[in-house]
Amino acid sequence: RDVAPSRGLGDVYKRQLLMKHRDIDFHIYTSPLDLSASFRAMAELAENTSVKKIEYTNLLHTAEACIEWHAWYQDMEGELWQMDMIHIQEGSRYDGYFERVAERISAVLTDEMRLAILKLKYETPDTEKIMGVEYYQAVIQDGVRSYPEFEEWRRLHPVVGVVEWMP
């Protein structure tokens, strides 16, 4: 069985930034990106009875040059984890970009910033969908420290497409 190289993106355990939303990101790089092979790999994943749902978005004909897979896995305690698996064309615009962002965040993140990010994540209503990079940019770049400040920051910095920020 051929297995494409995968890079765990968030590395949330290393930076200790996981709070409430059980979400793990992986980037899988191949050249060429074979849509059928991607579906075959996900079919194997779907055979695991702990995988409860899988979604797919084809972005091959965009600047992102990828396929987004989102799977929900139920752990032994009954908690659902979201696994975001982004299958990316090697050599495309975003090849390695998000891994570099994660490395830069790790390099500049202080304990005080980490705690501020965790506090904001904790205070975020469960119904609110916010990308991790929004928290990181608000805290690291703009010094946001309270949830009301964060709400205002988000109003002034709406997300449109891919967030291309790097500390």
Range-by-range predicted roles:
Residues 82-167:
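Catalytic cores of NTP-dependent nucleotidyl/adenyl transfer enzymes across multiple folds
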